[in-house]
Curated annotation (Swiss-Prot):
Belongs to the peptidase C15 family. Its EC number is 3.4.19.3. Removes 5-oxoproline from various penultimate amino acid residues except L-proline. GO terms for molecular function: pyroglutamyl-peptidase activity. One of its GO terms (cellular component) is cytosol. This is Pyrrolidone-carboxylate peptidase 2. It comes from Photorhabdus laumondii subsp. laumondii (strain DSM 15139 / CIP 105565 / TT01) (Photorhabdus luminescens subsp. laumondii). The gene is pcp2.
């Protein structure tokens, strides 16, 4: 009997001056769904250094997923961006939700300088574009909690769960957020949900990534 695959998708609580976070607004819509034969489990992460990783690790232990996709908000970006790499540095320009603001500190003191996503990032971008969803590969996840979570996730998987693949997708503001900032791009929630469905589908279908699709980095 074949065991059904499971996907863990996470989104963040609101941070900064925002009252919503599109990453969680979208991710929670996938809770309990079946996509490409896999069951989706959604979990919310706090926008807090270290605590976010403790919550993520607990979720991985609980769900025992085949795939982990962490989703974050990238206000100002116009499209879905699939992160290529996470670096071993915390360098926060604003405090997290508990007032922590680490500057130039390592995420894992003995860890490598960086980890590459183990998701098929080119396949995901191509799948999104083929469906009419604007998407690109990003070469930086920043140095705030999203990068912290991506690095911590990939370090945890490499050390404890090497069979699990994972990575991070950044999504734009929702229209109701962007309306407060003149000229800021946004993406409808329904489009973001579709994008996450496609990302999961492509990741499950492609155990190996496709050739570079000519994406322009952002």
């Amino acid at each position: 009997m074949t065991t059904q695959k499971t996907v863990l998708i996470t989104g963040f609580e609101p941070f900064g001056k925002e009252t919503i976070n599109p990453s969680w607004e979208a991710a929670k819509q996938l809770q309990g769904r079946e996509l490409c034969g896999a069951r989706v489990e959604a979990r919310q992460l706090p926008c807090v250094f270290d605590v976010s990783l403790a919550c993520l690790y607990a979720a991985i232990d609980d769900v025992q997923p085949d795939l982990v996709i962490a989703v974050g908000q990238a206000g100002g970006r116009p499209n879905i961006t699939v992160e290529r790499v996470a670096i071993n540095i915390n360098d926060a320009s604003i405090p997290d939700n508990q007032g922590n603001q680490p500057i130039n500190t390592p995420i894992v003191a003995t860890g490598p300088a960086a980890y590459f996503a183990t998701l098929p990032i080119n396949a995901i971008v191509k799948g999104l574009r083929d469906a009419g969803v604007p998407a690109s590969i990003s070469q930086t996840a920043g140095t705030f909690v999203c990068n912290h979570v991506m690095y911590g996730l990939l370090h945890h998987l490499a050390c404890i769960y090497p069979e699990i693949r994972g990575g991070v997708l950044h999504i734009p503001y929702l229209p109701e957020q962007a309306a407060r900032y003149s000229g800021t791009p946004s993406m409808a929630l329904e489009t973001v949900i579709t994008a996450l469905e496609i990302a999961i589908d492509e990741a499950l279908k492609n155990s190996e990534d496709i050739a570079n699709n000519g994406d322009t980095a952002h």
